[in-house]
């Protein structure tokens, strides 16, 4: 590193690092006198220094017949019992009789068809049990089989005046309604409702009621109606 006459380095941030020397740590006398343990014995180093013998390079002699068939032991699989190569290489044909027995069950009915029929029978049996329980608890109610009639006052909800027995059933059996549902009951609880249709119906009803209210007020008090005021002014 070049130094100027005034003793300032050319590169101000470069400084000469100090030379540090470390002495080896002092060892105990027991460690210095004890010999280092050898991982490998003398036999290993002796065999490593020797040249490889020709027996190492020789391959294990395997008969050509056993090498082709893959059998390592003599007499285990004699070649006379093996099938010919063309029989081993060709594709196996499916047996139609076994396929028909697997796919078809008793009476020549396929297994999938039998499973579906069993499932449908189970569903019918469960539905019949549910209907019997409902008849025992609620009896035969004629209101449950009637369709939903939307009232003009309520937006999509049946009026209580038309179905008074529904309110009695709800008050008497509030918890059993969710457990068992007949198709008629489900029709009462569910209706093809959409928010757009409902909003349009409510808006049309509000406009109709507003128009009727304005006509009634105009007839009663024509001075408050702007059209009535114009007519009154023209007549005067």
UniProtKB/Swiss-Prot annotation:
Effect of residue 23 to A: Loss of phosphorylation site
Annotated consequence of substituting residue 182 to A: Reduced phosphorylation. Phosphorylation is almost abolished
Region (Interaction with CCNA1 and CCNA1/CDK2 complex), start-end ranges: 75-99
Regulation: induction: By serum starvation.
InterPro entries per record: INCA1
GO cellular component, one term: cytoplasm
Superkingdom assignment: Eukaryota
Phosphoserine found at: 23, 191, 194
PTM comment text: Phosphorylated when part of a complex with CCNA1 and CDK2. Strongly phosphorylated by CDK2 on its C-terminal region spanning amino acid 149-221. Less intensively phosphorylated by CDK2 on its first 75 amino acid residues.
GO annotation, biological process: apoptotic signaling pathway; fibroblast proliferation; negative regulation of cell population proliferation; negative regulation of cyclin-dependent protein serine/threonine kinase activity; negative regulation of fibroblast proliferation; positive regulation of apoptotic signaling pathway
One MF term in the entry's GO annotations: cyclin binding
Short sequence motif named Nuclear localization signal, residue ranges: 90-95
Keywords: Cytoplasm, Nucleus, Phosphoprotein, Protein kinase inhibitor
Function noted in UniProt: Binds to CDK2-bound cyclins and inhibits the kinase activity of CDK2; binding to cyclins is critical for its function as CDK inhibitor. Inhibits cell growth and cell proliferation and may play a role in cell cycle control. Required for ING5-mediated regulation of S-phase progression, enhancement of Fas-induced apoptosis and inhibition of cell growth.
Record's subunit section: Interacts with CCNA1. Interacts with CCNA2, CCNB1 and CCNE1. Found in a complex with CCNA1 and CDK2. Interacts with ZNF16; the interaction inhibits INCA1 activity and induces the cell cycle process. Interacts with SPACA9. Interacts with the CCNA1/CDK2 complex. Interacts with ING5, DAZAP2, RNF26, USP15, SPOUT1, DPH7, TRIM26 and RAB5C.
This protein's name: Protein INCA1
Naturally occurring in which organism (per UniProt): Homo sapiens (Human)
Lineage: Eukaryota, Metazoa, Chordata, Craniata, Vertebrata
Gene designation: INCA1
């Amino acid at each position: 590193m070049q130094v100027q006459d005034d003793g300032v380095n050319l590169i101000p941030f470069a400084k000469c690092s100090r030379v540090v020397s470390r002495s080896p740590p002092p060892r105990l006398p027991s460690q210095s006198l004890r010999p280092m343990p050898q991982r490998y014995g003398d036999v290993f180093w002796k065999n490593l220094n020797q040249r490889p013998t020709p027996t190492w390079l020789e391959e294990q002699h395997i008969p050509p017949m056993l090498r082709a068939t893959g059998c390592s032991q003599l007499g285990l699989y004699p070649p006379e019992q093996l099938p010919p190569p063309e029989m081993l290489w060709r594709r196996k044909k499916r047996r139609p009789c076994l396929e028909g027995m697997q796919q078809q069950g008793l009476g020549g009915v396929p297994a999938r068809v039998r499973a579906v029929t069993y499932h449908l029978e189970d569903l019918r049996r469960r539905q019949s049990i549910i209907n019997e329980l409902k008849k025992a608890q609620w009896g035969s109610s004629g209101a449950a089989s009637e369709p939903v009639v939307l009232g003009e006052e309520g937006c999509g909800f049946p009026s209580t005046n038309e179905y008074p027995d529904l309110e009695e059933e709800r008050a008497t059996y509030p918890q059993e309604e969710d457990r068992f549902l007949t198709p008629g009951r489900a029709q009462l609880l569910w209706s093809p409702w959409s928010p757009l249709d409902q909003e349009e119906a409510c808006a049309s009803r509000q406009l109709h009621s507003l128009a009727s209210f304005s006509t009634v007020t105009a007839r009663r008090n024509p001075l408050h109606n702007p059209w009535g005021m114009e007519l009154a002014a023209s007549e005067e």
